[in-house]
């Protein structure tokens, strides 16, 4: 329940309900914002993450009411120490992203993304595209 509350608060803060408050990760967490810049309605973002080539975990980010994720909205995934094996080398972190339509069908968003991750940092993935032309994901330049 504590993690769900943290995710909801982070989503609200990053989506503009923050009143100007900046999102920060504490020293035992890093955050990845998943920004929807797609040209169509998507309902969930599925992610799978790895250390090197080893699958570690995954999950879904979506609106609590099941509604479409609006263009420009940011959903946040927090990563804590317990999400990784002891001694995991976060410089070998990789994440794969998929969008999910209203019927539950998943669409890949390009290649697996690499990140030299570190606790205490906030990162953002920009998701673009549509069902006809395909989707892509890339790290934000900012």
Tell where the protein language model's regions lie, with residue ranges.
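Positively charged n-region of N-terminal signal peptides that target proteins for export
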Residues: 1-4
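C-terminal motif of bacterial Sec signal peptides marking the signal peptidase cleavage site
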Residues: 13-16
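Bacterial signal peptide processing site
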Residues: 18-21
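Asparagine-centered strand-capping/turn motif at beta-strand->loop junctions
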Residues: 23, 32-39
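Short acidic, flexible loop segments centered on an aromatic residue
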Residues: 37-55
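Tryptophan-paired
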Residues: 52-89
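A short, solvent-exposed beta-strand micro-motif common in secreted/extracellular proteins
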Residues: 88-102
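Structured interaction patches on ligand/partner-binding surfaces of diverse proteins
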Residues: 98-132
């Amino acid at each position: 329940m504590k993690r769900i509350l943290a995710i909801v608060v982070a989503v609200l803060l990053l989506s503009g309900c923050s009143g100007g408050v900046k999102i920060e990760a504490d020293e035992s967490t890093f955050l990845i914002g998943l920004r929807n810049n797609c040209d169509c309605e998507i309902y969930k973002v599925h992610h799978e993450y790895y250390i090197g080539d080893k699958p570690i975990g995954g999950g879904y980010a979506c609106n609590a009411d099941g509604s479409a994720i609006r263009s420009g909205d940011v959903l946040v995934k927090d990563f804590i120490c317990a999400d990784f094996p002891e001694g995991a080398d976060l410089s070998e972190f990789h994440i794969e992203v998929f969008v999910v339509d209203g019927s539950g069908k998943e669409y890949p968003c390009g290649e697996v993304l690499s990140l030299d991750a570190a606790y205490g940092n906030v990162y953002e993935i920009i998701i673009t595209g549509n069902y006809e032309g395909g989707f892509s994901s890339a790290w934000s330049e900012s």
